[in-house]
Amino acid sequence: MVNFVSLCDIKYGFVPKNSTDLFVKRKIHKLPSRGDVITRLPVFGSNARENLNAKPRRNLRVRPIFCKSYGDAAKVYQEEEIPRAKLIWRAIKLPMYSVALVPLTVGASAAYLETGLFLARRYVTLLLSSILIITWLNLSNDVYDFDTGADKNKMESVVNLVGSRTGTLAAAITSLALGVSGLVWTSLNASNIRAILLLASAILCGYVYQCPPFRLSYQGLGEPLCFAAFGPFATTAFYLLLGSSSEMRHLPLSGRVLSSSVLVGFTTSLILFCSHFHQVDGDLAVGKYSPLVRLGTEKGAFVVRWTIRLLYSMLLVLGLTRILPLPCTLMCFLTLPVGNLVSSYVEKHHKDNGKIFMAKYYCVRLHALLGAALSLGLVIAR
């Protein structure tokens, strides 16, 4: 009795198309004599050729063929093959630090429009402090998402990369302390209490957004908090700090400043919204009810399209009413192709987690370019 077991592994492509693809070859333990003829027999064929010279009758027992699919394993394998350098780049989130640069630069440009002053040293101090605050937001977000399980399979999570929750949290708290120290020191030098209160409000928004016991991002309030923190609070505070001098301690809060801060908050919130497209299933599993979890990706793509339209409609209205200087409006409309790119990309790929991951980076590009255009327009209007 001869036993045959065939294991087919789809991963390596060894899959028999039909029964005649499987053959049995008789094992030979001695040199064949002149009369022996060895043939290959199909396992299942009813018309199997027989050894004409062999008198004994051989019985074949065929066992089932087990075929395994490695579709899921292939995905895991692909994830494991992502270079560590690329994972570190994702963890650093360097493009995301534009959310520190844009409010500061727009605020500085608005202050220059009002006063004709640019305080370079104060600008650099505020920039470094803002970067430290964003670092705290990123690190603490990874820590608390690790605690809830939201980042369990997120390979670019800082906690997963370094393997230490405690170390990551310590780095986050250190960044927060240094960043707040820089902001307070600058505010005290400028003798501007309003700026201190606005910056404190912005940081408070960041805390209740992700830190326990609040974690308001899990209730779908992340986007409004992001809008307030980086728009009216941070942008206006930077305007006040960078326009304060020995001659002018208190700047007026004009419509140009407030409208500019609204635009900054608008595009910052869009980044946060689009960053959740590829995380819908994971967020839902841990009870994180972001707007995209509630809406679904198809309705989310619809929201992105109309958000882009609303953004440029606001620009048009602000330009026609002369709330924003004409150079600002013209410069900002040059970014319209990037806005269309964000809208079309999300609409096309919102169901593809592999591609929609890039949507937030297109939003970062729009945010940075619109901020640069807005800043340049304010400077030109001077």
UniProtKB/Swiss-Prot annotation:
<dbReference type="InterPro" id="IPR000537">
    <property type="entry name" value="UbiA_prenyltransferase"/>
</dbReference>
<dbReference type="GO" id="GO:0009507">
    <property type="term" value="C:chloroplast"/>
</dbReference>
<dbReference type="InterPro" id="IPR011937">
    <property type="entry name" value="DHNA_phytyltransferase_MenA"/>
</dbReference>
<feature type="transmembrane region" description="Helical">
    <location>
        <begin position="99"/>
        <end position="119"/>
    </location>
</feature>
<dbReference type="GO" id="GO:0031969">
    <property type="term" value="C:chloroplast membrane"/>
</dbReference>
<feature type="transmembrane region" description="Helical">
    <location>
        <begin position="257"/>
        <end position="277"/>
    </location>
</feature>
<keyword id="KW-0472">Membrane</keyword>
<feature type="transmembrane region" description="Helical">
    <location>
        <begin position="168"/>
        <end position="188"/>
    </location>
</feature>
<dbReference type="InterPro" id="IPR026046">
    <property type="entry name" value="UBIAD1"/>
</dbReference>
<dbReference type="GO" id="GO:0042372">
    <property type="term" value="P:phylloquinone biosynthetic process"/>
</dbReference>
<comment type="similarity">
    <text>Belongs to the MenA family. Type 2 subfamily.</text>
</comment>
<dbReference type="GO" id="GO:0010236">
    <property type="term" value="P:plastoquinone biosynthetic process"/>
</dbReference>
<feature type="transmembrane region" description="Helical">
    <location>
        <begin position="196"/>
        <end position="216"/>
    </location>
</feature>
<keyword id="KW-0934">Plastid</keyword>
<feature type="transmembrane region" description="Helical">
    <location>
        <begin position="224"/>
        <end position="244"/>
    </location>
</feature>
<feature type="transmembrane region" description="Helical">
    <location>
        <begin position="323"/>
        <end position="343"/>
    </location>
</feature>
<keyword id="KW-0812">Transmembrane</keyword>
<dbReference type="Pfam" id="PF01040">
    <property type="entry name" value="UbiA"/>
</dbReference>
<feature type="transmembrane region" description="Helical">
    <location>
        <begin position="123"/>
        <end position="143"/>
    </location>
</feature>
<keyword id="KW-0150">Chloroplast</keyword>
<feature type="transit peptide" description="Chloroplast">
    <location>
        <begin position="1"/>
        <end position="66"/>
    </location>
</feature>
<keyword id="KW-0809">Transit peptide</keyword>
<protein>
    <recommendedName>
        <fullName>2-carboxy-1,4-naphthoquinone phytyltransferase, chloroplastic</fullName>
        <ecNumber>2.5.1.130</ecNumber>
    </recommendedName>
</protein>
<dbReference type="GO" id="GO:0009772">
    <property type="term" value="P:photosynthetic electron transport in photosystem II"/>
</dbReference>
<keyword id="KW-0808">Transferase</keyword>
<feature type="transmembrane region" description="Helical">
    <location>
        <begin position="361"/>
        <end position="381"/>
    </location>
</feature>
<keyword id="KW-1133">Transmembrane helix</keyword>
<dbReference type="GO" id="GO:0046428">
    <property type="term" value="F:1,4-dihydroxy-2-naphthoate polyprenyltransferase activity"/>
</dbReference>
<comment type="function">
    <text>Involved in the synthesis of phylloquinone (vitamin K1). Catalyzes the transfer of a prenyl chain to 2-carboxy-1,4-naphthoquinone.</text>
</comment>
